Amino acid sequence: MSAPRTCYGIIPARYASSRFPGKPLADILGRPMFWHVYDRARRCAAFDEVALATDDARIADAANVLGVPCVMTAEHHPSGTDRVHEAAMRLGVADDAVVVNIQGDEPALDPRMLDQLVAPFADASVRVATLAMALSAQEAQSPDRVKVVVAANGDALYFSRADIPFVRDGDVGGDTAGRLGHIGLYAFRMEALRRFTQLPPSRLEQTEKLEQLRLLENGIAIRVVPTTYRTHGVDRPEDIDVIINLLRENDG
């Protein structure tokens, strides 16, 4: 009998996108974007299985041609996290197993980030983990960059689009406040992932438009792992050229 699988990487990939329809199929160096994400993810030694989760037959067909494991999910989900949960259910993931939500629009993702993200689960008390990196004072001014404040034990105190922590005294524009920018990669114990999908959207979540606040408001701790690795997502077609340059630099 084979050993039970304990760590899954799931890549949500939906076809519909207001800014970039068909984004998972966008050509990058001769292969669709989702393949590059899968290729990066499978380099993470912690994963027992990596699979695509999609609602679209065109993406599923392309995945099958390229030998990428694929799970078909419902078309309508409130978030990518809900799609990941459905895929994990279909894969029969055990409650104590770890499920990593790997953003499908991060084709230049450094696999070492995934290793860092999964590492805290050696502690059986950890239920959710995410990544953060140092921000300059200038970067922290943008509401598009989500900030996180971390407790002494490494758990998140709060996430915000505002510049936190606020520096009341001293050089407000300086870099001495230890600002951290959130990186939107999450790992969950399966039971915590299920709990997240069962909870209604919370007050702070709706205020900030940040779904991770649903966890904090309901007493579910999020372990924050610092990283120095950078990545670049694809929001619009013009981002593809940036990704191609990054891939050539990293793999050249």
Curated annotation (Swiss-Prot):
It catalyses: 3-deoxy-alpha-D-manno-oct-2-ulosonate + CTP = CMP-3-deoxy-beta-D-manno-octulosonate + diphosphate. It comes from the Bacteria. One of its GO terms (cellular component) is cytosol. It is an enzyme of class 2 (transferase). One of its GO terms (molecular function) is 3-deoxy-manno-octulosonate cytidylyltransferase activity. The keyword Cytoplasm applies. It is found in: Cytoplasm. It holds the Pfam family CTP_transf_3. Its EC number is 2.7.7.38. Keywords: Cytoplasm, Lipopolysaccharide biosynthesis, Nucleotidyltransferase, Transferase. Pathway: Nucleotide-sugar biosynthesis; CMP-3-deoxy-D-manno-octulosonate biosynthesis; CMP-3-deoxy-D-manno-octulosonate from 3-deoxy-D-manno-octulosonate and CTP: step 1/1; Bacterial outer membrane biogenesis; lipopolysaccharide biosynthesis. InterPro entries: Cytidylyl_trans, KdsB, Nucleotide-diphossugar_trans. Belongs to the KdsB family. Activates KDO (a required 8-carbon sugar) for incorporation into bacterial lipopolysaccharide in Gram-negative bacteria. HAMAP family: KdsB (MF_00057). This is 3-deoxy-manno-octulosonate cytidylyltransferase. It comes from Nitratidesulfovibrio vulgaris (strain DP4) (Desulfovibrio vulgaris). The gene is kdsB.
